[in-house]
C-alpha cells in the first residue's frame, strides 16, 4: 500500500471492498499512509472500524508544531496515538505479518521493518522531510519511505502468489499554493509518482482511485469521505475487470526477481 498522506484513508476503503469480494491478505507491505492503514488492519480491526479511532481528531491533535530546525512538526503525539489505540506494541505481535518501509536518512537506502516497536516504525515511514522531524531508531535517523519506494510491491513479491497493489497517489492536484509546505509536498509527489511506476508493473491487481487529488493533507475531518472514494473506486475496478476480462488478475511472472 502506497503513501498518500490524508488519502491513506482510501486504503481502508479499498481494503473493505476487497474483503467483501473475498480477497484477504496473508501479508501486508506498506509505506507512510499505507503503513498506517496496514497496521490497524493487521492489529485485528475491520477497515471501516478504523475510522472510529480518528473521529473527532484534527491534524494538529496528532502533531506538535516546533521551532523549525529539522522539521516543522514533531510526531510525538502521533506515536502516543498509535500506542493508545493499537493492541500490539511490536510488529511481531500483530495478527498479520506487516512490513513497513522507511528511508534510512543516514545511509541513503531503504529500510524494511518487520519487527520492533510499531509506533516508532510507522512514524518513521510517515516522516516526510521538512514537514516532520526525522525519527531516530537505534542511532539511525529515518524519514518517509516513499522517497525511495512509494509503492512497496517488491518487498513481498517473492513470497506471494498474488499481489494486490493499492496506489492512492496516482494524480496530483493541478493547482497548488506558493508556500514552503505546498512546494515541498508537490516536489515530493513527483518523486513518489516516479518511483511507483516500476512497482505498479509487478502487481497482479492494481487499484488506483483517480478521484483523490482535491483533498488537502490537513482535512482529517473528511476521513470517511476519502474512505468511500477508495471503497467505491475499488468496487468499480473489480466489477469492470470481471466484465471486460472475466478475471481481476493479470498474468505476471517474476521468476528472476
Feature map (PLM): residue ranges:
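Patatin-like phospholipase
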Residues: 1-31, 39-257
